[in-house]
């Protein structure tokens, strides 16, 4: 049967739309240097936007194509997932079920790594942001159901799917579930487990009041053009023929933020809005060789961050859990030796800049940081003992000065296991 005229016209329009979109995704080669494309960075894009250069596009494509293992608990097999694959599967599934995806972005340290890999920060988690409308509880639930259902597609051949339920998949592969629903923030996060800490984090965002702490972690890279190119173009990418990819700095000025990343500068806007975790990020940057820019009021910045840390994490159990998770996520493997330096830096900042606590509360937190630092030092082996910052030469081995903490150093067992735990329900996020 021949198609009707209306059907033919409909197909032609659809083909024209795809062709137009694919053509729009293709651009002339950017300069081979490490900076943004000067043409794409014109004033028409706005100061907060910039086109990526060809080397940056290549790094982005390689990052999205690199298989990442999603480790299963118990007898569940390890899944091998390319980030671009899971983005495409999740996006198409959401839209098939009526939830429109307005765009997909790479966020955080992975985006910073694509723009400037020599910063020394590296990246752990792969943060993929889906812009969606989350106006109802059903929308939140749909994002979770779609991600869990998509995991079935990545199970190895030969694995029986008959008795595998979404609840089973959640227990097997999900590291963390977070749901935030307030007047200013509506988003959810699903983190997929990776034993090395390189979790794939799928974040579904309707609105977020603030998505960055400092200029160097404010970057987002729009992935739509690159994903469309890989689907539509039979020609491989080259310097002369590749998609035009746009980056954005939520800090405001893209060129300024990129300059901060290159020269290891700590800068921010509205420091009073930084969340509690910003204090840990700040100490992390200091340990990596970043320094506040000369115009920064360092004392005020540190006081803001300390105050917010104790607002968001008011008791010792929460503080310990937060510190251990952060250290495990950012200082594992070859970087484990930096844990001690980060904790010493955190101790100094909290000691100098905490003004919102009673003296005994402040002392409890400092003692907690000290205990974690001693534990980190012990894990480095006996040779590291000479680096103990709080030890006086005349103090006998194993004794910590009374001016800091009044107890002997003994083997410390972590209160919370470092193994990746599962979270069966949404976690509240302040």
Curated annotation (Swiss-Prot):
UniProt enzyme class: transferase
Keyword presence, Membrane: no
Keyword Amino-acid biosynthesis: no
GO cellular component: cytoplasm; nucleus
Location of the protein in the cell: Cytoplasm; Nucleus
GO MF terms, alphabetically ordered: poly(A) RNA polymerase activity
Lineage top rank: taxon: Eukaryota
Annotated segments matching region Disordered: 1-46
Enzyme Commission number(s): 2.7.7.19
Pfam families: NTP_transf_7 (PF07984)
Catalytic activity from the UniProt record: RNA(n) + ATP = RNA(n)-3'-adenine ribonucleotide + diphosphate
Regions of compositional bias (Low complexity) in chain numbering: 15-44
Chief location of this protein within or outside the cell: cytoplasm
Keywords recorded for this protein, A-Z: Cytoplasm, Nucleotidyltransferase, Nucleus, Transferase
Biological process according to GO: mRNA stabilization; negative regulation of apoptotic process; negative regulation of cell cycle; negative regulation of cell population proliferation; positive regulation of translation
Record function comment: Catalyzes the transfer of one adenosine molecule from an ATP to an mRNA poly(A) tail bearing a 3'-OH terminal group in an ATP hydrolysis-dependent manner. May be involved in maintaining the translation efficiency of at least some genes through preventing degradation of their mRNAs. Prefers RNA molecules that are adenosine-rich close to 3'-end. In addition, may inhibit cell proliferation and cell cycle progression through ubiquitination of beta-catenin/CTNNB1.
Family, similarity comment: Belongs to the TENT family.
Name of protein: Terminal nucleotidyltransferase 5B
Gene that encodes the chain: TENT5B
């Amino acid at each position: 049967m021949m198609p009707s005229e209306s059907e033919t016209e409909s197909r032609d329009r659809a083909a024209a739309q795809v062709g137009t979109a694919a053509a729009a995704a293709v651009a002339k080669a950017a300069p081979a240097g490490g900076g943004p494309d000067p043409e794409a960075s014109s004033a028409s894009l706005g100061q907060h936007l910039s086109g990526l250069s060809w080397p940056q596009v290549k790094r982005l494509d390689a990052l999205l194509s690199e298989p990442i293992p999603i480790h299963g608990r118990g007898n569940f097999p390890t899944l091998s997932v390319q980030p671009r694959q899971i983005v495409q599967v999740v996006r198409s599934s959401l839209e098939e079920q009526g939830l429109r995806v307005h765009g997909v972005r790479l966020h955080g340290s992975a985006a910073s790594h694509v723009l400037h890999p020599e910063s020394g920060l590296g990246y752990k988690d792969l943060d993929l942001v889906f812009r969606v409308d989350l106006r109802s509880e059903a929308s939140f639930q749909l994002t979770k159901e779609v991600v869990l259902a998509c995991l079935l597609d990545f199970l190895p051949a030969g694995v029986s799917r008959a008795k595998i339920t979404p609840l089973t998949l959640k227990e097997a592969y999900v590291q963390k579930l977070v749901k935030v629903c307030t007047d200013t923030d509506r988003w959810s996060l699903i983190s997929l487990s990776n034993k090395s800490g390189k979790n794939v984090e799928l974040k579904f965002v309707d609105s977020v009041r603030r998505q960055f702490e400092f200029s160097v972690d404010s970057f987002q890279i729009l992935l739509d053009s690159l994903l469309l190119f890989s689907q539509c173009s039979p020609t491989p990418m080259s310097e002369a023929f590749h998609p035009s990819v746009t980056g954005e700095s939520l800090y405001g000025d893209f060129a300024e933020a990129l300059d901060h990343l290159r020269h290891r500068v700590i800068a921010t806007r509205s420091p009073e809005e930084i969340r509690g975790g910003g204090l840990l990020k700040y100490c992390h940057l200091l340990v990596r060789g970043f320094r506040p820019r000369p115009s920064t009021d360092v004392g005020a910045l540190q006081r803001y961050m300390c105050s917010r840390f104790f607002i968001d994490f008011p008791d010792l159990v929460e503080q310990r859990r937060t510190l251990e998770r952060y250290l495990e996520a950012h200082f594992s493997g070859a970087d484990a030796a930096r844990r001690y330096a980060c904790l010493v830096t955190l101790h100094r900042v909290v000691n100098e800049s905490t003004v919102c606590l009673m003296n005994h509360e402040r002392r409890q937190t400092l003692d907690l940081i000290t205990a974690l630092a001693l534990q980190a030092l012990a894990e480095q082996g006996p040779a590291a003992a000479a680096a103990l910052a709080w030890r006086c030469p005349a103090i006998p081995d194993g004794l910590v000065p009374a001016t800091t903490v009044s107890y002997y150093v003994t083997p410390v067992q972590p209160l919370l296991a470092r193994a990746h735990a599962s979270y069966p329900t949404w976690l509240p996020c302040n």
